[in-house]
């Protein structure tokens, strides 16, 4: 039994919206709920806003700020660019659902391209920011130290790539119907 073209368009649109919701929830979990911490173990906490190392002298974590991070070899500009990339990706991803809904309701290719542009920029920013941050702090990290925040950002990046491919393969439907509001 063949699925009609209308249902196929609606199913692909719903799948795309579900993927967008998953990306937003994964990025919100990692960057807001986990406060950007990629490693949060008892003797080490490293994230976009936390850099705490275990001090044997005092027997607890000692957190460092920008002046001390420069002494440790982490440039202030590099850390700021990594933060901008990762948190900017979340901000751009938040703006994706509205153009998608408008493109679906109005059958407008321009709004669809705007959503694809937001997703593409979000994907590039997330990959660049996360890579830069890992490059800057890798001498204190091990692969086994990376926690759920890191895993959710990696999964969000993979879903962003899948989402971009899906949006290119399933563009908005043709302008055949006159009453657009009933199709939303």
From Swiss-Prot:
Cytoplasmic face of the membrane: 1-12, 105-117, 171-184
InterPro entries for this protein: TM140 (IPR028038)
A single GO cellular-component term on record: membrane
The organism's place on the tree of life at top rank: Eukaryota
Main location: membrane
Compartment(s): Membrane
Glycan attachment points: 37
Pfam families, per database record: TM140
Extracellular side: 34-83, 139-149
Keywords linked to the UniProt accession: Glycoprotein, Membrane, Transmembrane, Transmembrane helix
Residue spans crossing the bilayer: 13-33, 84-104, 118-138, 150-170
Membrane protein topology class: Multi-pass membrane protein
Listed name of the protein: Transmembrane protein 140
Organism from which the protein derives: Rattus norvegicus (Rat)
Gene behind the chain: Tmem140
């Amino acid at each position: 039994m063949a699925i009609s073209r209308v249902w196929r368009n609606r199913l692909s649109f719903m799948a795309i919206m579900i993927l967008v919701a998953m990306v937003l929830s994964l990025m919100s979990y990692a960057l807001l709920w986990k406060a950007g911490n990629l490693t949060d173990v008892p003797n080490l906490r490293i994230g976009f806003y936390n850099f705490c190392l275990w001090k044997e002298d005092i027997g607890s974590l000692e957190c460092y700020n920008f002046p001390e991070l420069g002494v440790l070899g982490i440039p202030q500009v590099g850390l700021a660019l990594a933060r901008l990339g990762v948190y900017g990706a979340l901000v751009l991803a938040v703006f994706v659902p509205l153009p998608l809904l408008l493109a679906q309701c109005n059958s407008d290719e321009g709004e669809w391209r705007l959503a694809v542009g937001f997703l593409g920029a979000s994907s590039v920013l997330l990959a660049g920011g996360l890579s830069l941050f890992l490059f800057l702090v890798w001498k204190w990290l091990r692969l086994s130290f990376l926690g759920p925040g890191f895993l959710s950002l990696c999964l969000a990046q993979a879903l962003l790539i899948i989402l971009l491919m899906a949006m290119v393969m399933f563009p908005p439907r043709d302008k055949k119907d006159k009453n657009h509001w009933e199709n939303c």
